């Protein structure tokens, strides 16, 4: 089937935000009038961008206290690596790579966590104590799943702290 997901890409950035289930995902099976369904789906996805911008603006206006930033980062690490061993710390994935991500707001924390999780390259330790670098995510499926999960985590944090 053909699938369209709304997303938000920062300028000069390769970590595209795939919004969670709450913001219009469109699937078109390969049967019937596929072309018409794809066109309708494209209009539906385009209509979602105003809601995405509203969420982004709300996240930018919410200053996150350090414990909330740590909780968001810990949830992301647990989602990605599980409970057993996490090769990096919350401080590692909360360290911004870009000047514009040094803010104290939810959006900056979300963008920083997302970029660090997707790009990898963060120094850490294996379960046996050996020095390692986290791996970048290259799989489309893993990328989409992680992006969705991070969006839902950020959205949940936004709703609970408003």
Give, region by region, the residue ranges found by the protein language model.
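Intrinsically disordered, low-complexity regions enriched in serine/threonine
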Residues: 2-162
